[in-house]
Amino acid sequence: MEATRMLLDANPKTDAILYSADVMAVGGVHYMNDHGISIPGEIAVIGFNNSTSACECYPPLTSIDNNGELCGQLAVQMMLRLISHQPVDDERVPCELIKRATTEGKL
């Protein structure tokens, strides 16, 4: 919440914030709610991970789902290949924007 306060104090015309994790975004949403900042009216908010906290906060948090289960599966496969001295290819994991109320009318 302190980071959100500092950001908004330094940049009062901010109209959107993308947080690197849902837990940080939820803290930011709490700060904005406590200080009368309208979400998404004044500021749109997006988190990252699509955790359960994204659905539980108010308003519900728009989040980027980074497909964590697939990331874990690929990581294990890569480690096993490395252990057996086999080449490892780069992998791209698709992400999905899960739109919820914190960006309503903005995206």
State what each model feature region is:
Residues 5-6, 10-107:
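Flexible loop/turn connectors
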